[in-house]
UniProtKB/Swiss-Prot annotation:
Removes the phosphate from trehalose 6-phosphate to produce free trehalose. Trehalose accumulation in plant may improve abiotic stress tolerance. One of its GO terms (biological process) is trehalose biosynthetic process. It comes from the Eukaryota. Belongs to the trehalose phosphatase family. Pathway: Glycan biosynthesis; trehalose biosynthesis. It catalyses: alpha,alpha-trehalose 6-phosphate + H2O = alpha,alpha-trehalose + phosphate. It comes from Oryza sativa subsp. japonica. Its cofactor is a divalent metal cation. GO terms for molecular function: trehalose-phosphatase activity. Its EC number is 3.1.3.12. The gene is TPP6. This is Probable trehalose-phosphate phosphatase 6. It is an enzyme of class 3 (hydrolase).
Length: 370
C-alpha cells in the first residue's frame, strides 16, 4: 500500500450525449443560509484539501443527525422557521399537490422511474440491515413497473438492495450506480438486450475496497455503535448509533484510513461516511446510462422521474436540470439545498405518489382516443 497524500483526479467514464432540453428549469435556489454553510462544510469534507479541520466533519455529521432533525422540528413547531419552510415549499412544492402539473408534462412522452431505496421506499432506521420496505410499498413499486420502466438506484450493494425489494422486473443500480444490472424477469418495457445489461465501471477497485472494509472493521471496534458495511464498490461507515462525543474520533479513523488509498475518495450521506473509487461515476451517471440502455439516450419523448432523499441523489437531480428534461423529487420533511423541483415528506407520501401515477396511467389507457 502506498502512503502518499497525493490527490488522484477522477477518471472520466464515457457517457452518451445529453438529450435536447424539453422542460426549462428555474435555477436551483437554496433555503436561506443553506448554500454558504454547504460550501463551508464541503470544503472540510474535501479529502484533496487534506481535511485540516476535523470540526467541519463533526458539524456536518451533526447536521445529518436525528437529534438535529428533532431540534429543527421543535423550532418549526414553535413557528421559528415557518417563513423559511413556506418559502422553500414555493420553490419545491409537494409532488402530490402539483401532481396534475407533473403528469401534464409527460404528455407525448414515456415516463421512466428512478427510485432511491433508504428513506424513499423504506424508513431510515438505526440498523441498516433492518431497513425493510413494507409489503404495501412493494406492491406499489410492482404496479409502477407494470406501466413504466423502473430502476432502483441505491448506495447499497446491488445484491443487498435486491434482497430488500425482491422484484425481478426492475433495473438495479447499486453502489451509487457503479454496479448496474438489467431485469432478471422480462416485461413489456424491457428491450431485448435489457436482461443482458451489466455495467461495473469500477471493477478494478474491488480488491482495494475489500482491504479498506476489513481494515475499518478492525479500526472502528473501539467506537461503540459504529457499523462498517461492504457495499461492493464502496465502503459505508454508519454513525447513526455512535455517541456524538465519539464522532470526532471516528472521523479521524476514517480519514487516516484514506491516507493509504489515494485512489479512493470520501463522501458523506445521511449519518454515513462512504469511501468510493475516484472515477467520475455517480447516481447521475447511472441515470444517463440506464436511459441509454432503454433506448432513450437522444430522445426528446422521454420524461425521467427521479425520487430520492439523500445528498448523493443530488447528482441525479443535477443531471435532470442540465438536460432540462425530467422531474426531480426530494424526500424531506425539512428545507434543504437541492436541485430537485418538487418534494415529498416521507416514504408514505412516496407511495401515495406512485399509486396516483399508476391510477393516472390506467385511466389514461382506458380513456377513448378520439
Amino acid at each position: 500500500m502506498t502512503k502518499q497524500s497525493v490527490v488522484v483526479p477522477e477518471v472520466a467514464v464515457p457517457m452518451p450525449p445529453n438529450s435536447a432540453p424539453l422542460l426549462p428549469y428555474p435555477p436551483p435556489r437554496a433555503a436561506p443560509g443553506v448554500a454558504v454553510r454547504k460550501k463551508y462544510l464541503q470544503a472540510q469534507l474535501d479529502l484533496g484539501a487534506g481535511l485540516p479541520l476535523i470540526n467541519g466533519w463533526v458539524e456536518s455529521m451533526r447536521a445529518s443527525s436525528p437529534t438535529h432533525a428533532k431540534a429543527a422540528a421543535a423550532l418549526a413547531a414553535a413557528g421559528a422557521v415557518d417563513d423559511e419552510r413556506a418559502a422553500w415549499m414555493v420553490r419545491h412544492p409537494s409532488a402530490l399537490s402539483k401532481f396534475e402539473q407533473i403528469v401534464a408534462a409527460s404528455k407525448g412522452k414515456k415516463i421512466v422511474m428512478f427510485l432511491d431505496y433508504d428513506g424513499t421506499l423504506s424508513p431510515i432506521v438505526d440498523d441498516p440491515d433492518s431497513a425493510f420496505m413494507s409489503d404495501t410499498m412493494r406492491r406499489a413499486v410492482r404496479s409502477v413497473a407494470k406501466h413504466f420502466p423502473t430502476a432502483i438506484v441505491s448506495g447499497r450493494c446491488r445484491d443487498k438492495v435486491f434482497e430488500f425489494v425482491k422484484l425481478a422486473e426492475l433495473y438495479y443500480a447499486g453502489s451509487h450506480g457503479m454496479d448496474i444490472k438489467g431485469p432478471a424477469k422480462a416485461s413489456r418495457h424491457n428491450k431485448a438486450k435489457a436482461k443482458g445489461v451489466l455495467f461495473q465501471p469500477a471493477s478494478e477497485f474491488l480488491p482495494m475496497i475489500e482491504q479498506v472494509h476489513d481494515s475499518l472493521i478492525e479500526r472502528t471496534k473501539c467506537i461503540p455503535g459504529a457499523k462498517v458495511e461492504n457495499n461492493k464498490f464502496c465502503v459505508s461507515v454508519h454513525f447513526r448509533c455512535v455517541d456524538e462525543k465519539s464522532w470526532s474520533t471516528l472521523a479521524d479513523i476514517v480519514k487516516a484510513e484514506l491516507k493509504d488509498y489515494p485512489k479512493l475518495k470520501l463522501t458523506q450521506g445521511r449519518m454515513v461516511f462512504e469511501i468510493r473509487p475516484t472515477i467520475k461515476w455517480d447516481k447521475g451517471k447511472a441515470l444517463e446510462f440506464l436511459l441509454e440502455s432503454l433506448g432513450f439516450a437522444d430522445c426528446t419523448n422521454v420524461l425521467p422521474v427521479y425520487i430520492g432523499d439523500d445528498r448523493t441523489d443530488e447528482d441525479a437531480f443535477k443531471v435532470l436540470r442540465k438536460r432540462g428534461q425530467g422531474i426531480g423529487i426530494l424526500v424531506s420533511k425539512y428545507p434543504k439545498d437541492t436541485n430537485a423541483s418538487y418534494s415529498l415528506q416521507e416514504p408514505a407520501e412516496v407511495m401515495e405518489f406512485l399509486l396516483r401515477l399508476v391510477e393516472w396511467e390506467r385511466l389514461s389507457r382506458a380513456r377513448p382516443k378520439w
